[in-house]
């Protein structure tokens, strides 16, 4: 943390990853309103940070302001699959160059995802194996490709380089695996990310059963006014379990939620709700993990669960 930002006169390009959360406790503006980019990328809009933006309208307004911050004659690379993003782009300034993107062409073979673009000047279709998977990741890669294109990086250069990209930290992080089992943990906690992450794992391993755990840990996810945003988000999992710690709610000084509220909000009758982390360990120990994957999603730690130990035990169990 000694050097969180470094700017030099010799750098011709500066890349910032920022979001709509507050710049600091004393500067209540969203971080991304301070950047004034020449090239902006907008990947999607899904309501979050209810403690700062209590209504969806107030949340959406920040993204409108973000687009307005783009420099004169700048570029906006945006995901056209997101209806909220599309609606904002329609009303963007006329001097802004609009560059849409969506899910690229790909295929999955033997648990590996390949990008399959048609590159100009090549006889055969390109085939690029990736270390990441899931349509949300592939869509983001496509957006990154178009940003790179604006600064002179060719598509072929991008595709060759992206095959070594291991993904963002704490996103679909492989904890353990055996020939017929895989255990992933992921930072997903917002409804859209939970849904996308579960769908990614299920699509990558369609023949395997998937058990997915989600810890409600953030202020938004534990707020009764936000819980309904999670409706249907875990439906793709074969077994879905939500965990929350009532003591965390007390610590955050928000109104308590009940197991019944959680189950109703997720709109899945078979959903299980745990409030004691010991129940998680017991559940995992009682399952058969042959041809069966485990996914654990949280911005926290499931109250200190030892992921590495669980992974090692499950691998031994499946050998």
What name fits each language-model region?
Residues 1, 18-26, 58-61, 100, ...:
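Short gly/ser/thr-rich secondary-structure transition/capping motifs
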Residues 1-6, 137:
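Conserved phosphate-binding catalytic cores of ATP/NTP-utilizing and phosphoryl-transfer enzymes
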Residues 13-25, 183-189:
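Switch II (G3) loop of P-loop NTPases
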Residues 15, 36-183, 207-208, 260-264, ...:
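Acidic, Mg2+-coordinating active-site environments of NTP-dependent enzymes
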Residues 20-22, 46-47, 82, 188-190, ...:
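Short, glycine/acidic-enriched loop or turn micro-motifs at the edges of active sites
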Residues 21-36, 192-200:
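Switch II of P-loop NTPase G domains
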Residues 39, 64, 90-97, 143-319:
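ATP-dependent carboxylate-amine ligase
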């Amino acid at each position: 943390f000694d050097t969180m930002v470094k700017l030099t006169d010799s750098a011709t390009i500066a890349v910032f990853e920022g979001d709509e959360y507050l710049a600091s406790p004393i500067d209540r503006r969203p971080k991304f309103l301070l950047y004034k980019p020449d090239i902006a990328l907008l990947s999607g809009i899904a309501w979050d940070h209810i403690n700062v933006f209590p209504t969806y309208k107030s949340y959406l307004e920040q993204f409108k302001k973000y687009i307005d911050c783009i420099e004169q004659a700048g570029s906006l690379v945006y995901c056209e699959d997101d209806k909220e993003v599309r609606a904002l782009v329609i009303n963007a300034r006329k001097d802004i160059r609009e560059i849409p993107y969506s899910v690229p062409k790909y295929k999955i073979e033997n648990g590996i995802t390949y990008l399959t673009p048609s590159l100009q000047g090549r006889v055969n279709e390109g085939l690029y194996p990736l270390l990441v998977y899931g349509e949300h990741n592939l869509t983001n890669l496509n957006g990154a490709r178009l940003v790179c294109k604006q600064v002179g990086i060719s598509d072929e250069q991008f595709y060759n380089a992206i095959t070594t990209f291991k993904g963002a930290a704490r996103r679909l992080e492989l904890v353990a695996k055996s020939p017929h089992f895989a255990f992933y943990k992921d930072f997903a906690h917002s409804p859209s990310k939970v849904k996308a992450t579960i769908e990614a794992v299920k699509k990558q391993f369609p023949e395997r059963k998937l058990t997915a755990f989600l810890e409600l840990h953030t202020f938004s996810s534990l707020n009764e006014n936000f819980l309904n945003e999670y409706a249907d988000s875990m439906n793709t999992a074969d077994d879905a379990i939500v965990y929350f710690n009532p003591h965390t709610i007390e610590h955050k000084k928000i109104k308590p939620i009940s197991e019944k509220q959680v189950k109703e909000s997720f709109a899945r009758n078979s959903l299980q709700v745990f409030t004691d982390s010991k129940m998680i360990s017991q559940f995992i120990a009682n399952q058969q993990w042959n041809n069966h994957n485990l996914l654990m999603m949280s911005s926290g730690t499931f109250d200190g669960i030892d992921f590495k130990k669980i992974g090692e035990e499950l691998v031994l169990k499946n050998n």
